[in-house]
C-alpha cells in the first residue's frame, strides 16, 4: 500500500515538494525485492539457493531492460500540462495496483507455521548447521554496504556523464540501460545460476572495478557500451551472490530477519552513494570521481577475495 501511495503522489505532483514526498514514502515502504528474496529462500534448499536467487535477479533484470525504455517513451506523452510525467506515473500506478492484487489473491504463504515439536526439531537442526557457517553477517552486511555505496553513486552519475560527453537524451539513456538489462538477464539465466555464490560475487566486483577504470577514461560510445557490458555483469552477480551467502548463514526461522538487515545496509549505501558521488563528480570532475570510485571498489574486491569464504555445506 505504501508503494501505491507513493506513486499516487507522483501522479498528482505538480510541485517539487509533492514529488519529494512521493519519493520519501516510496523509500519507507520499499520491500518488494526483499519479499521476493525471502520467498526464494523459503522455497529452496542450500543447493538450490544460488540458482533460485539468480532467477529472482533475472526477473529484476528483465524489468530493468524494459522499464527505463518504457518510462522514457511515456515521458514524451504529456496529458497533464502541470505534470509532464503524469502518463509514466499513471502507468506505474496501474502496474503496482495489479501487483498488489496479485500478491493478495494469488500468492500463497511460503513460510509455513510449524507445530511446537517441529519447531524444536528445526531449532536443533539449525544449531547444528549454523556452527559450520563461515561468513559473519557483519562482514556480509559491510561488504554489501561498501559495494552499493560506490556502485549506486556511479550508477546515478551515468546520465550526467553521457550527457556531457555524447549529449544523450532520455531515449539514448533508455537504450543504454536497456542494453545493461538485457545482458544482465541473459547472464543470470545462464551463468550466475550455475556458479557458486562466492565466485559470483568475486566476478561481479572485479567487473565493476574494470568498469570504473574504463568510465574514467572513455571517449567513444563503443567504449561506453563496453563499460556498460561490464556493469551488466556486475548487476547480474554481486547483489544476488551476497543475498545467497547471507541466507546460508541464517537458520530458517531467522532468515527473513537476516536478509532484511542485509538489505537495509545496502539501502544505507544507496542513500549515501548518489549524493556523495554525484557531488564529487560535479566538484572535482569525471576523472577524479571515477578514480575515487575505482579505489573504493578495489577495497570491495579485497573484501570479496580476502574476507569472504565459501560456506562449508555449499
Regions found by a protein language model. Give the residues of each.
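Short amphipathic helix-loop junctions that connect adjacent transmembrane helices
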Residues: 156-173
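C-terminal transmembrane helical hairpin of 12-TM major facilitator-type secondary transporters
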Residues: 199-242
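C-terminal membrane-cytosol helix-exit motif in multi-pass small-molecule transporters
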Residues: 95-113, 303-308
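Glycine-rich segments within core transmembrane alpha-helices of 12-TM secondary carriers
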Residues: 51-75, 265-273
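Hydrophobic core of transmembrane alpha-helices in multi-pass small-molecule transporters
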Residues: 6, 17-31, 223-237
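Transmembrane alpha-helices of Major Facilitator/SLC transporters
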Residues: 173-195
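A membrane-interface helix-boundary motif in multi-pass transporters
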Residues: 76-94, 279-299
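Cytoplasmic helix-loop-helix junction between adjacent transmembrane helices
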Residues: 20-60
